Amino acid sequence: MDQPRRWAVEVVPGADRDRLCPLPRHDVVPSRSIPPTALAIAQAIRRVRTSARCGAAEHRDLFADPAWDMLLDLYVAEATGRRVSVSDACIAAAVPQATALRWLNMLDQRGLVIRTADQTDRRRWWMTLSDAGVALVERMLPPTMT
């Protein structure tokens, strides 16, 4: 049986409200082998995009693509063994839920994500990147040094 999830409140300066964020779990196993350098780059990009949305208003449009936010979140989640529900993916997009769901449908239609029904809760669906989704994110990351 899964251990209960621990949560912390993340205070985001300039945001309309604080967010509940899951604390890292050390008992999870990554579902895909992602190079550590690529993971570090993806995590850094995600942090920059999150903080930039809260920053200067004149530059917010540079960080406004919800599809990229969802793809990055799913990429990092797979590398760290974290499961992502549809609701989690919508939160990662930082847009209204209806907008995020439209983007998820588009990503699904393009074969970049895979939706899997939760075996214990028929209301919940899990999201993962398809092989094509992983390849797209890795193509978009800056070249890594080995």
Report each predicted region and the residues it spans.
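DNA-contacting interfaces and partner/effector-binding or oligomerization modules
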Residues: 1-32
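Amphipathic alpha-helical dimerization/coiled-coil segments
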Residues: 139-146
